[in-house]
Amino acid sequence: MPPASPSNISRKPLTGGPEKISVARLPVTGSDVFGREEDIAFLNDAWAKQQVNIVTFIAWAGVGKSTLVNHWLRLMSAEHYHSAQLVFGWSFYRQGSGGGTSSADEFLDATLTWFGDPDPRLGTAWEKGERLAKLIAHRRTLLVLDGLEPLQNPPGPQAGRVREPSLQALLRELAAFNKGLCVITTRLPVADIADYECTSAPRRDLEQLSSEAGAKLLRALGIKESVTQ
C-alpha cells in the first residue's frame, strides 16, 4: 500500500492551547526580570479569579510595565496560556522604525476583525466598543492593552479619562463582565473604571526595582556596578 500523501493525512487538532494568538503588536522588551515576584503572583491570581475582569499596572516610563507583562506572557505561553481560548495584545505605541502612536479607530478596526465581527465599520464608536466587548467577554480571552496613556487625558480635572468613546465603552463593559482578563499598562489610572477598582478591576502601582533587584538586572545586562553604589 503506497504511503499517504501529506494532504491526505488526517491530523487531530492540537488541544491545550488557545484557538488564536496575536501578540506581535506588543513592544519588544528585555527578557531579564528581577524583583517582580509579587507582581507576577498578582497577575496569576487575577487570571485564576473569575471575579477579576481587568487589572491595570500604573507607573511612569522606564519602570518596567511592558517588560513585566511580556515576561508573564512568556510564562503563560510555557503553560499553554492556562485555559485561554484567545490571546490578543495591542500597544498604543506603534512598533518599528516609524514610531508614533496608534489611534482608537485603528485599534477598533483590527480587533473587531480579529475577533470575528462581520462588519467592523457598522455603528457609532460607542456601539463598536460595546460590540467588541461582547466578542471578548463571552470567551476565556486574555487581552493585553499596552501603553494606554496616549488616549487618556493628561493630569488635570479629567486626568486619566479615556478620550475615545469606543474605548470607554469597551473598558466599562469588560469591567462589568468578562470571562477572561484584560491587562492594561499605563502611566495614569484609568478614571473610566475607577468605580470598579475595589471589585472587578483592581489597579496596581508598579514600584521601582529594589536596589538588590536593580543590581541583579545590571549584572544580567553586563553592566558593572559603580564603586560608589
Regions found by a protein language model. Name each.
Residues 2-43:
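Conserved adenine-nucleotide phosphate-binding loops and their immediately adjacent elements
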Residues 17, 36-39, 67-71, 102-113, ...:
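Alpha-helical sensor/transducer elements of the RecA-like P-loop NTPase core
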Residues 25, 135-137, 176:
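Short, flexible hinge/linker loops that cap or flank conserved catalytic cores
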Residues 31-34, 124, 162:
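Residue-level "hotspot" positions that anchor or transmit function at local structural transition points
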Residues 38-48, 52-159, 200, 219:
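Post-nucleotide-binding-loop coupling segment downstream of the phosphate-binding loop, primarily
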